[in-house]
Amino acid sequence: MINMRDNPTMHVLQASKFLFLALILIQLLSTQLFAQRSKSPWQTLTGDAPLVIARGGFSGLLPDSSLDAYSFVSQTSVPGAVLWCDVQLTKDAIGLCFPDVKMMNASNIQDVYPKRKTSYLLNGVPTQDWFTIDFNFKDLTKVILKQGILSRSAAFDGNSYGISTVKDISTQLKPEGFWLNVQHDAFYAQHNLSMSSFLLSISKTVIIDYLSSPEVNFFRNIGRRFGRNGPKFVFRFLEKDDVEVSTNQTYGSLAGNLTFLKTFASGVLVPKSYIWPIESQYLLPRTSFVQDAHKAGLEVYASGFGNDFDLAYNYSFDPLAEYLSFMDNGDFSVDGLLSDFPLTASSAVDCFSHLGSNASSQVDFLVISKNGASGDYPGCTDLAYTKAIKDGADVIDCSLQMSSDGIPFCLSSINLGESTNVVQSPFRNRSTTVPEIGSLPGIYSFSLAWSEIQTLRPAIENPYSREFTMFRNPRERSSGKFVSLSDFLNLAKNSSSLTGVLISVENATYLREKQGLDAVKAVLDTLTEAGYSNKTTTTRVMIQSTNSSVLIDFKKQSRYETVYKVEETIRDILDTAIEDIKKFADAVVISKKSVFPTSESFTTGQTKLVERLQKFQLPVYVEVFRNEFVSQPWDFFADATVEINSHVTGAGINGTITEFPLTAARYKRNSCLTRKDVPPYMIPVQPAGLLTIVSPASLPPAEAPSPVFTDADVTEPPLPPVSARAPTTTPGPQSTGEKSPNGQTRVALSLLLSAFATVFASLLLL
C-alpha cells in the first residue's frame, strides 16, 4: 500500500483530480442555469421573473414605512413581493424602518420636538434637520409618520402611524422577502453607532434576505461576518457624478468595473437612467449595462419607479409601459424593480409581459378614441388618427366642425383657439362672441374657409398644464395635418383593424339658424360619397350627439347607429327618460364621475347607471380616460390600467372613450383576466374603499349629490330649418389702421386679441 504522505507526486495528482471534478461540477451547474434561462421567457440572470420590491411598503399611497403600507403589499402584489426597509439607527442603537436619516420630511417630528433641530455633515454637506441619531427610540414613540411626497394624498397622515422597528416589521408581518437598505453607514460610524453590529445582532431573530448599501466599505466590513448563509449583498449605485466615499471614485466610474463589485456583491441596484438614459424627458438609446452586469454574474435591480413620478414622454404618462420597457423589451430583463406602487409592478410582471402583438383579446369592450390618440399628438390630426389605429383602437372618432364654405372636418373644438395657432395667425381679427356657444370671445371654425384652416398649425391640448404644469409630448406639440371628414372616413375604410367610426355632431341648431350650415346633411352626404351608405365597406358608423334632436334627424334619414351623450354628471336616471332615449339612440355615453362619484379625488361609491341603462339594452360608453395620474381618483393608485379595469370588469361598461387608446387596447389582452383565480392586482377596486381607512377628521366633506336625469332633460324641439346664407366672404388680414364705422381705430379688439394670443401661447405652445 502506497503512503500518500510519503509520495508528493500522488498527492499532487489527487489534488488535480479534485480540482478537475470541481471545475466539471461548476460547468455543469452553469450549463444547467443557462438551460433554465434559455427555456424561460425572462432574460434575467437566473431566468426567474423579476422581483417586485416595495419601497417602504405601498408608499405611493400610505406614509412610507408605516405598518399599513407594509401590510398592504401582500394584499395587492405578486406572491414573494419583497418589503424594502431603509434602516436608520437611533441614539440608543435601535434599528428603525424609516425612509431617511433626516426625519422632517416624512414625520411630524418638528411639531413634537421643535427645538431639537441640529446640523451635521452628511456626505460632506452641512445639513440641518432632525436626525435619528439625536433621539432615543422612546422619544420617537411620540412621533407619527406622514406622506413625504406632496403630489400624494395627505389624508392618511391623520391615521397616527407610529415609527416601526426592523424587528416589528419582521415579527408582525413575516414578509416572504425582507430587504434592508443601509444608506449612511459611514455617517453612523462617525457618531459611534455601528450598523454592522446592529445587523449581526438582529439577524439572529430576523431573516434578512437582501442587504444593500452605496458604500463599498460597508460590505468589506460586514461580508465575512455573515458567512455563507447570510443575505444577498447588493451594491447600490447613486447618481453617476456622486462620489463613493470609501473608494473616492464616482459611481459612473464604478459602473465600468463590474468585476470588482462581483468580489463582494451578488447584485447591483441602479437608478433607471443607468439603463435607459433620458434627455429633456425623452428616452435615449438604452445602454448595455444590464447585459454587462449579467455577463459579470451580477443581478440588476432598477430603482426609481413611481406611478406619479415624471416619466419620459415616450411612455405617454403610463407607468405600466415604463415597467414593461425594463423587463420585456426583447433584449434583457432587469432582475427586480424597486417601486412605490408594487401593484402596478406586479401586474406588469404577471399580466402584461410577453403578450406579443398577436395576443388575443380577453375581454369584450370597445376602445374608442377621443380625437384620435390626442394624448400623444394634436387631436384630430392625421398623426393622432394613425397612432390610434396602430395602438389598437376599435373605433376612431371625429369631432365634426364646419368651415365657412361648408366643408365638414374633424377638430376637437368649434373654437379654433383651443386647438390651433389661429390667435397667432393673420386671422386673429375674426374673433367674435357667440352666446349660444360660450360667454368668451373666440375664433370659430365657421369664420374661416377650409383652405384658410389648412394654413393653421394644430396645437396639442394640455388639460393639466395650468394646475399641475404637466405638458404632453412637446416635440410633437404642433405636428400633423388637419383632416376633413372625407379623409377621415377614407382612412378608416382602408384600415383592416378598425371596426368602426364615431362622428360627434354638436352645435347643429346654431349652425343651421345663424350660419346657414347643415351639419347633418354634410355628414350624410360625405358618408355616401365615401361608400358607407351602399355597403361597400363593413366599417360600423356611429353618430354621437348631446342633442336628441340631432339624433332624431339622423334616424329619420339613415340607418346608422346613434349614440346619446349625457353631458352632465348624474347619479341616476328615470326609467321614463331611458325609454325616451331608447326611441332615438342605440347607445349612451356618460362620464366617469357618473359611474364612480368622487370627493376630493376619493371615490365615494358606485351608481347603478350602467346597470340600469344596460337593462334597456343600451350599451354604455364612458369618457374620458386619460393616462395622467392626476386624472384618476386616489383609489386607482395613479394607474390608468387599474381605472380601466374597475370600469370594465367592475362596473361592466361596454366601451372606453380614451385619449390614449394603447392603454385600453393593451388591457384587453391582459393574461390575468381569464384565470380561475384572478390575482389581487387585477381585482376591481372597492368603491369608497380607501375612505374606510381614512381617519374621521381627514375625511373629505360630503358633496351635494349629482342630479337625476329626467324626461325633461331628454326632450328638445326639433332642429330648425337651414337659414339662407349670406354670400360667403373671406376677409383677409386686418390692417392696424382699419377704421370702424364711427371712425375710431379698433384698439379695444386688438388689445383683447393680443391678450388672447399671449394666454394661448403660454398654455398650449410652450
From Swiss-Prot:
Q: Which InterPro entries match?
A: GP_PDE_dom, PLC-like_Pdiesterase_TIM-brl
Per the record, what are the reactions this protein catalyses? Answer: a sn-glycero-3-phosphodiester + H2O = an alcohol + sn-glycerol 3-phosphate + H(+)
Report TM segments.
746-766
Q: Which UniProt keywords apply?
A: Cell membrane, Cell wall biogenesis/degradation, Glycerol metabolism, Glycoprotein, Hydrolase, Membrane, Repeat, Signal, Transmembrane, Transmembrane helix
List the GO biological process terms.
Answer: cell wall organization; glycerol metabolic process; lipid metabolic process
Gene3D superfamilies, per database record: Phosphatidylinositol (PI) phosphodiesterase
EC class name: hydrolase
Q: Which GO terms describe its molecular function?
A: glycerophosphodiester phosphodiesterase activity
Which family does the record claim for this protein? Belongs to the glycerophosphoryl diester phosphodiesterase family.
Q: In its UniProt entry, what is this protein called?
A: Glycerophosphodiester phosphodiesterase GDPDL4
Which organism does this sequence originate in? Arabidopsis thaliana
Gene name in the database record: GDPDL4
